[in-house]
Regions:
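Acidic, aromatic-enriched beta-alpha/helix-loop junctions
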Residues: 39-91
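N-terminal domain-onset segments
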Residues: 1-31, 117-118
Length: 118
């Protein structure tokens, strides 16, 4: 299974609170319609501080915090951690996946995965 966050993807994600509104990574649950579009990300350090993923201190991170839009029960902008995504398990042990074919998309154009079924 592909990794949820590669070094190459890390280089494309601006730090949290940079004001960027372009999703660069898409995560989804293969057993439901939950979908996360990440526009910004920062490394969380052991002392609780956050630094850009491009910062050399990010190598010693304890987690990665994302900001973007989530389509779950409803559309919601907010924050989530990489570790939270990695811990989620669905039926038969299914895990969150990264859309390998996703291209950067403005957040306001990201699609609700259930919209076409309404």
């Amino acid at each position: 299974m592909p990794t949820l966050l590669t070094r190459k993807l890390e280089q494309t994600l601006p730090p949290i609170k940079s004001g960027d509104n372009v999703a660069r990574v898409k995560y989804f649950t293969p057993w439901s319609t939950w979908t996360w579009y990440a526009a910004e990300a920062s490394a969380e350090l052991e002392d609780g501080s956050e630094v850009p993923l491009s910062d050399p201190r990010a190598r010693d991170r304890v987690d990665v915090m994302f900001w973007g839009v989530v389509f779950g029960h409803e559309k919601e902008y907010g924050y989530w951690r990489l570790s939270d995504l990695a811990e989620i398990r669905g039926p038969m042990g299914l895990m969150i996946e990264r859309d390998l074919y996703f291209h950067s998309t403005p957040l306001d154009q990201c699609q609700d995965p259930t919209a076409r079924h309404r």
